[in-house]
Amino acid sequence: MKPEIIDNFFDHREFDYVKNAFSNLEYSPIPGASGEETEILHWNYYSVKTIYLNDEPVDESWGVIRDIFLPKFHLACQYKTMLRVKVNFYPYCETFHKHPYHTDQDFSHQGAIFALNTCNGFTEFEDGTKIDSVENRLFLFDPSVKHRSTNTTDAMGRFNINFNFF
């Protein structure tokens, strides 16, 4: 599945609501984002807030996903059931860094990344395809295909919502 980009996924009012709903979450830091270093570098982390996991909501912000995102998902793709939803925060750093390639799961399924802000960070696939972080952009892809994230050097951080689903 070649990544499919949907810009302006929400109208302005809906996007402002979604952005505000996810701007004040408490994130848990994940050290060693690159997965390679044994020593934690000052830039080598990201933070995550898990919203949905193992067939159940694990955070109250699931209501926003259920009420705002899922109706649009039905229009944009063949969504049947959610596997995982998490919000990622990649912090600003003076130096631009690409994390190693990874897959979200070992089996083919659908995924989407929704950008909450615009910055010079991006998602890159092994074939060189690069999807820029542009606020209110959703892109659909197969997360079993190797891809990687980046930090940002031109914003406070890179914020996105990651969906894995069938």
Predicted regions and their residues:
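Conserved metal-binding segment of the jelly-roll/cupin
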Residues: 92, 131-148
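A short beta-strand-loop-beta hairpin characteristic of the jelly-roll/cupin
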Residues: 95-100, 107-109, 115-134
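Short beta-strand segments enriched in hydrophobic/aromatic residues
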Residues: 89-91, 116, 165
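Short beta-strand His + acidic residue motifs that chelate non-heme Fe in jelly-roll/DSBH
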Residues: 100-102, 146-154
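Non-heme Fe(II)/2-oxoglutarate
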Residues: 1-80
